[in-house]
UniProtKB/Swiss-Prot annotation:
It is found in: Cell inner membrane. GO terms for molecular function: membrane insertase activity. It comes from Bordetella pertussis (strain Tohama I / ATCC BAA-589 / NCTC 13251). One of its GO terms (cellular component) is plasma membrane. Interacts with the Sec translocase complex via SecD. Specifically interacts with transmembrane segments of nascent integral membrane proteins during membrane integration. It is a multi-pass membrane protein. Coiled coil: none annotated. GO terms for biological process: protein insertion into membrane; protein transport. Gene3D superfamilies: 2.70.98.90. Keywords: Cell inner membrane, Cell membrane, Chaperone, Membrane, Protein transport, Transmembrane, Transmembrane helix, Transport. This is Membrane protein insertase YidC.
């Protein structure tokens, strides 16, 4: 009865299953676990016009929300397509944003502090409107009287402000448009060193009758995975909705297309966003005002996440302001938490959040001391191993005792042959005599598994790892080792661990145990270097612990034999 090997075999088999499942998904086939395969449309971009603009549909312009007075839907806005469009490029110390004067919409966002790769000086392009990616932020006003339309994200605006670069602490980018008796002044306020943009919509009634407008804030994105997405480990790309009532909710593009996504529809708090590995965008309306959230498919492989808020009645000659925040940037948990409640939850650790968050806090504290994320991973692994040393010691002592009685166990198997009942009785008697717990080598490992899985997700999800060097050849801990040195070291440490364990009496099982390092090491060839570094350090410390404990037990046994 070797429970530990059974557990290892289960882990090995499940890992192979996950590897095959990811390969199936990568090749567009259904998941083995019942999830949808990637959409066939995911490789197709939304159709674009001659200017590279994604084709519009009437579905991309909302009707008034239920909270607003009854009003007709905005007519299909194909007419503005003929208007001359001006692209306005605004630069801060951390962002380069491109706005289209048609709709005063954000059509490109470059993150100047985040290179696209460790081999490139070009900034990461998070949002764009091109043949490769459609990902934009839009706003507009609906609820116009019958036959009229208010300015939407397809209405021509004109630029009022003149500054294009941030020279002080803030920069205002101002657009204006008037339609249907409503003048809309849209102001984007950018801040030095920040990824949140203040957005104000000032609405003035220039007509002779009261108006009841409603403002929508929306993000549009195609369903393709971000560049560099790995087939060997999964990260979420899709929509996120947060509210105090239902907390953090994720919705895949596939569920939006099938109209089966679960999210809060009516709320007076929270935000909507689009999440991908390391980065996110989000609209955060003013809290305390009722709004309607909508997730929908605009056209093939193009999806919208929007929130619509009734402004209230604006009398002739009067005006109203609606403020919101737009986040465009990395998943920086500290900065996001300062912008809106729950925004930092885009870094989603799932059911292990209760363990992962303290680990991340400890990791950031260690980085403040060490100044290098690679050495931070090493130090964090050492601390975790130290905390679990008593459990590990119990496990290794149990394995060492099992190794000592292995010859006697083999003799019992030869004596009783196929008589399983007598063999098990004899084994249990031997375990009682030698004070060995067959589960002693397994249970301490099981207790540690949630912590190690949580640490895995912390290292995988943390944008701090992106572009972070360690030493010598490791220039980016978020990508695979370019020379595969760390995976080779990991395989070597796994072989050493197997050699330190009792040899399985079953030859087939022994061969399987020797194959495991090759399989896991092969998988690590495609994993981020930071994760492989963690496993290398963890295995090395485990070997040192196991060797020390085994040697001590052997000395104790030798001393007892000499007495």
């Amino acid at each position: 009865m070797d429970i530990r090997r059974t557990v290892l075999w289960m882990i090995f088999s499940f890992s192979l299953l996950l590897l095959w499942n990811n390969w199936q998904i990568h090749n567009g086939k259904p998941s083995l676990f019942g999830g949808p395969a990637p959409e066939a449309a995911a490789t197709q971009q939304p159709k674009a016009d001659a200017n590279g603009t994604a084709a519009s549909s009437t579905a991309s312009i909302p009707s008034s929300p239920a909270a607003a007075p009854a009003a007709a839907s905005v007519p299909g806005a194909a007419a503005p397509a003929a208007a001359k469009s001006e692209q306005v490029v605004i630069t801060t110390d951390v962002l380069r944003l491109t706005f289209d004067s048609n709709g005063a919409q954000l059509i490109r966002a470059e993150l100047l502090k985040y290179p696209s790769s460790s081999q490139s000086d070009k900034p990461t392009v998070l949002m764009d409107r091109s043949a490769d990616l459609v990902y934009v932020a839009q706003t507009g006003v609906v609820g116009a009287p019958q036959g009229e339309s208010f300015p939407t994200h397809q209405t021509p605006f004109h630029l009022v402000s003149s500054e294009r670069s941030l020279t002080g602490d803030t920069l205002d980018v101002v657009f204006e448009a008037e339609s249907g008796g409503l003048k809309v002044t849209k102001t984007y306020t950018l801040h030095r060193g920040r990824y949140d943009v203040d957005v104000r919509h000032a609405m003035a009634n220039t007509g002779g009758a009261p108006l009841n407008p409603a403002l929508y804030l929306q993000l549009e994105r195609d369903g393709t995975d971000p560049a560099g997405t790995s087939s060997f480990y999964h990260t979420f790309t899709g929509v996120a909705v947060y509210s105090e009532q239902d907390k953090f909710q994720k919705v895949t593009f596939s569920d939006i297309e099938k109209k089966k996504g679960t999210y809060i529809k009516q709320a007076d708090n929270g935000w909507i966003g689009i999440v991908q590995h390391y980065f996110a965008t989000a609209w955060i309306p003013a809290q305390g005002k009722q709004r309607t959230n909508e997730l929908l498919q605009v056209q093939q492989n193009l999806y919208a996440a929007r929130t619509i808020e009734a402004v209230g009645t604006i009398a002739p000659g009067s005006s109203a302001n609606v403020d919101a925040h737009l986040w465009v940037g990395p998943q920086d948990q500290k900065a996001m938490a300062a912008v809106a409640p729950g925004l930092e939850l885009v870094v989603d650790y799932g059911w292990l959040t209760i363990i992962a968050k303290p680990l991340f806090t400890l990791m950031t504290w260690l980085h403040g001391l060490l100044g290098n994320w690679g050495w931070t991973i090493v130090a964090l692994t050492v601390i975790i191993k130290a905390v679990f040393f008593p459990l590990a010691a119990a496990s290794y002592r149990s394995m060492a005792r099992m190794k000592q009685v292995a010859p006697r166990l083999q003799a019992l198997k030869e004596k009783y042959g196929d008589d399983r009942q007598k063999l098990n009785q004899a084994m249990m008697e031997m375990y009682r005599t030698e004070k060995i717990n067959p589960l002693g080598g397994c249970l301490p490992m099981v207790v540690q598994i949630p912590v190690f899985i949580a640490l895995y997700w912390v290292l995988l999800a943390s944008v701090e790892m992106r572009g972070a060097p360690w030493i010598l050849w490791v220039h980016d801990l978020s990508v695979r080792d370019p020379f595969f040195i760390l995976p080779a070291i990991m395989m070597a440490t796994m072989f050493l661990q197997i050699k330190l364990n009792p040899t399985p009496p079953d030859p087939v099982q022994a061969k399987v145990m020797m194959i495991m390092p090759l399989v896991f090491g092969g998988m690590m060839f495609f994993f981020p270097a930071g994760l492989v570094l963690y496993w290398c350090v963890n295995n090395t410390l485990s070997i040192a612990q196991q060797w020390t404990i085994t040697r001590n037990l052997e000395r104790q046994a030798a001393a007892a034999a000499n007495r």
